[in-house]
């Protein structure tokens, strides 16, 4: 017996497949962001880049973990470069032209992230270091023994 065509239950799946697999367009309109603030937070173990608009609402963000870096690779300058490019990509498409940059932390990825942002074509209005400095507060962690 020859193979017949497969029966599709249109009552269940509708004419064009189940609703689960249909793609609906977003009803949100794309915002134009001429100015914003880029926060670069670097620690000894990770780099996080957050882009906010003028009112402080987060537009885009990325970290070394979300860019699929694991373990000791998260702290490298290359990871910071990829993180900065990943966070800035959607915002450049939305028309970001000028941004304040706020650097926090003393990690290795500070300069790499800053270089990547400058190559992306976004102009800097100011670069500000907002690293919290204690006035003899908590005792720092012990140095690693080798």
Curated annotation (Swiss-Prot):
InterPro entries: Ribosomal_uS11, Ribosomal_uS11_sf. Its main location: plastid. It comes from the Eukaryota. Residues 126-146 are annotated as: Disordered. One of its GO terms (cellular component) is ribosome. One of its GO terms (biological process) is translation. It is found in: Plastid, Chloroplast. Keywords: Chloroplast, Plastid, Ribonucleoprotein, Ribosomal protein, RNA-binding, rRNA-binding. GO terms for molecular function: rRNA binding; structural constituent of ribosome. Part of the 30S ribosomal subunit. Belongs to the universal ribosomal protein uS11 family. PANTHER family: 40S RIBOSOMAL PROTEIN S14/30S RIBOSOMAL PROTEIN S11. This is Small ribosomal subunit protein uS11c.
